[in-house]
Design a protein with these regions (language model features):
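Intrinsically disordered, low-complexity RNA-associated tracts
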Residues: 222-246
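Conserved helicase RecA-like core
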Residues: 1-221, 244
Length: 246
């Protein structure tokens, strides 16, 4: 927020200030208090994301299984947004999904605006099955028809959990939220559950729990191969029906 404050400090005192924000958090409230006089607030949409319109799963697994299980979820659920903590993590998951044959796009602050716009356009137009994003880059995403949100890495707090999860269950529809949890993270994630007002058991992955979606498989573009990644596809364990085209 510091650059915004610096700009406002250079503006003349007698002015009209109109503030637009995708979220009304404490930082935005500080801006309103410090730089606006008797402001009128206009909010569009519900004041708070409803956790009741979503089905939440908290799956326990080792870190080594997260990539494979993410691919299986995308094949089962279709249009999915995957949230990662870091840019490098998002790139890695995007590469893993692509090498698993899934069309995926990555969205984070390390990309140019043109690259981010292209990734969003492909996801919005149904040209890929998964969008892998960091929290900052995903602010303001409003895409209809997202069936599932995956917390590949746990969010920082309950507020971030709500914000991420709210990318699905838009416009009164339902949504699936799946958190991929390692045992040492249980205490932190339990605190997040309390903050958002849910109480969900930690379980092993169970694809039979997931609802059936009409999924249109979108494969990754074929690339010329100049070497091997040493990935033995036939030896990998699958956790559900992958809905591969026959």
């Amino acid at each position: 927020m510091q650059p915004v404050c610096q700009i406002l400090d250079e503006c003349r005192i007698e002015r009209q200030t109109i503030l637009f924000s995708a979220t009304l958090d404490d930082e935005v409230a500080d801006l309103v208090r410090d730089y606006q006089t008797n402001p009128v607030t206009i909010e569009v949409g519900p004041k708070e994301v409803s956790m009741d319109s979503m089905t939440h799963y908290f799956w326990l697994m080792p870190n080594s299984k997260k990539s494979t299980i993410t691919s299986e979820i995308v094949r089962k659920c279709g249009r999915t947004i995957v949230f990662c903590r870091t840019r490098a993590g998002a790139d890695r998951v995007g590469d893993d999904l692509t090498h698993d044959g899934l069309a995926a796009q990555v969205l984070h602050g390390g990309l140019s605006q043109k690259q981010r716009d292209r990734a969003m356009a492909r996801f919005q137009h149904g040209e890929c099955m998964a969008l892998i994003a960091t929290d900052v880059a995903a602010r303001g995403i409003d895409v209809e028809g997202v069936n599932c949100v995956i917390h590949y890495d746990p969010p920082e707090n309950g507020k971030a959990y709500k914000h991420r999860s709210g990318r699905t269950a838009r416009g009164g529809s339902s949504g699936i939220i799946i958190s991929l949890i390692q045992k040492p993270q249980r205490k932190t994630v339990s605190k997040i559950q309390r903050e958002v007002g849910i109480n969900v058991e930690f379980t092993p992955p169970d694809f039979a729990q997931l609802p059936e979606f009409e999924v249109e498989f979108i494969g990754a573009p074929r690339r010329r191969s100049f070497g091997s990644r040493n990935r033995n596809e036939s030896s990998r364990k699958h956790y559900g029906n992958r809905n591969r085209p026959q």
